[in-house]
């Protein structure tokens, strides 16, 4: 009897196991459906692609013993390599972001549910075009933007004074390293003809205007070295042959530190990003059937919204959201093609908000091969969401509204035009 009982128990156990085999997948899916969150909308704020330094060589040369390398495009413009990189990023976005939203991973069907908005700088226009060429090749895609050079308050918000700058010991060491590179120093001996202007004086006092201007300039010069690297300058040109890629990664900390002190603090971030955040929140609210108090950035039917902005937009919005995303394998917190992502999900009929990043590696930017491993994704937790990465939308919305300065918010969107994407 005991053996018969054991046999029946085993048959029941095997039957239960069979219910979870592939042929019985719908049964198991039904059991877990209540805990599955479904994507309804993804919003991507992405930095434009690889560009030339924004200052012409004649200005940069004042800070270096040797002329800066020549670029294939004018100051601040997207390079051909940068355009190709944004096309590759667009193709990766389509493969990675579209299917979870119920959109096809290729072809033109459903592309009307993809909306793209770009800032008015020429590099942003060009980046938006390249991104959409990669995302939907051969399709009649369009993006929204103001004409080149016109101020767009979504990307160029208000201004506020930054707090006094502190130069910590590590930052001072990085400044001294960068100054040695600029001054053509080797083993303590420097070029006989020094730069016209020095970047860094060790006597610079914390909190002084000189500290602020030094860190801002250093961040920009360090980023120029990164841009040389990812553009593919050879070893003899990269930092005049005085830095390798590891040194560039170390010096990039100056750019991160500069933004940490000048862009992310709330007085600055609140003024700069309140308008953008208000319209992002309105877009999410409209997608769940609510009536926002300011204009949404896209119709409620939109599944993927991409905004092509700048590193400053990532920094100020990140500061306003109260999130950090530095990773040791991604030395630049704001690389070309780097993005902050807002996901609207639904679970058991309740809307949820998730914040994450998609950051390309410098090697991927250099090669132009933006495969899935090249984009590092980190999920971030809003401080007002009590440790929940999937934050109930009412909770997230209530906290985000406390971060927005109404005086900085414009109810209507800028009068952007619709631009066709060249074939």
What are these regions (language model features)?
Residues 13-22:
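Bacterial N-terminal signal peptides
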